[in-house]
Amino acid sequence: VFAATGPVEAGALGIEGAWGKACAKPLHSCDFCAGTSPLPSGLAFRVTPAGRRAWFGGIFKGAEADFSMKVTVERAELLKSLGHVHRVVERRNTIPILANVLVKADRGKLSLKATDLDLEVTDSIAAEVSPGGSTTVPAHMFYEIVRKLPEGSQIVLEGSGDRAVLALRAGRSRFTLQTLPESDFPDLAAGEMGHSFKLAAADLKRLIDKTQFAISTEETRYYLNGIYLHVAGTPKSGTLRAVATDGHRLAQVELPLPQGAAGMPGIIVPRKTVGEVQRLIETGEGDVAVELSSAKIRFTIGNVVLTSKLIDGTFPDYARVIPVNNDKNLVVDKKDFEAAVDRVSTVSSERGRAVKLSITGGRLVLSVTNPDSGSATEEIEVDYAADPLDIGFNSRYLLDIAAQIEGEVAVLKLADPGSPTLIQDQDAKGALYVLMPMRV
């Protein structure tokens, strides 16, 4: 119930009140809508549902509450497209429009867009459109409805009239979804991107897969909450390098510099963006177009366009923690080492996960002692010619790094029990890992 501060025409804008009836006039036709009629103080009135939709849908600004569209699309195509965009939408939103996906139909194409204000994903698919139109609907509900429809379904999306709902039909199933106007939907993709280049999806996938595990989840050090992507070396012989670290371990992977990337600034791509890009290039097929500025990055993968803000911070001078004088080389069979670490760590404490490596000659003994649950030891054959050494590591971190080694042999370059260890694949170049030791 609202208290008016001036005279109101009978039923204006869907108002019921002193006249006991709703307005029969079309919206925008009365003095109240036009803003020319004064309002008498103390008059109580109620706004009808239609009036509320008009009021809060931006009717005073001339925004159109109604929308008309009709789209026919294959269920499999719509589900795949929704799968690309709906993950961006947070489950809990204080801003209603951010819980929605923008649905836009025009000229034989259906476009879907979702955003969380930091990340935006757009996808488009072929569809029968007559007429075109646009609106927004709840993203996760829309996805779940389409997912649960039978395979092979033809889906019809239709909006018309002033009900502000999108109707969905497939076979004998009927749904209606509440909508919010397109005019409320934010556009993150706007703005110029000063640098652009292309690279194979397989190369981008390698950069991400081999560094993502080391991204920090500690929000206080926000500048570590992503992958640092930058040019290393000279423009002629440089590389595109990806680095991630959480302060306990560091991953660095590089590949030949793509054409056009030489002048790009160093950027930090957020963890959520990295995860979404990783899903989109899961097959590693085709090329990816990359555009970026100092504040945003855009990936175009087929029909999918992902635009993201970058982390506004300075990545630390990671080169200082990469050891260059470690002269104790421990050469291990990757599978044997990984399996042994996994077995003995079964009894480690959930908090510490410490595993001790005792190295003498051609023998490595891995041991774990947990006062609360027990102990474990295992011995494997290795290649090691330096002085005997005892050193401890977090077993989970060791396993994370071992999982990135593609070849049969891993090399651990050691110094002493208190210094970082450099780990590399003996057969593959372009990737290295640094792991800080722990007391055992």
What is the predicted function of each stretch?
Residues 1-13:
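Extreme N-terminal basic, low-complexity initiation segments
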Residues 6-7, 18, 32, 37, ...:
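Intrinsic disorder/low-complexity segments in short proteins, especially the signal peptide
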Residues 10, 14-17, 158:
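N-terminal hydrophobic alpha-helix used for membrane targeting or insertion
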Residues 23, 30-33:
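Cysteine-centered motifs
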Residues 28-31, 47-51, 55-440:
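Structural preference for solvent-exposed beta-strand-turn elements
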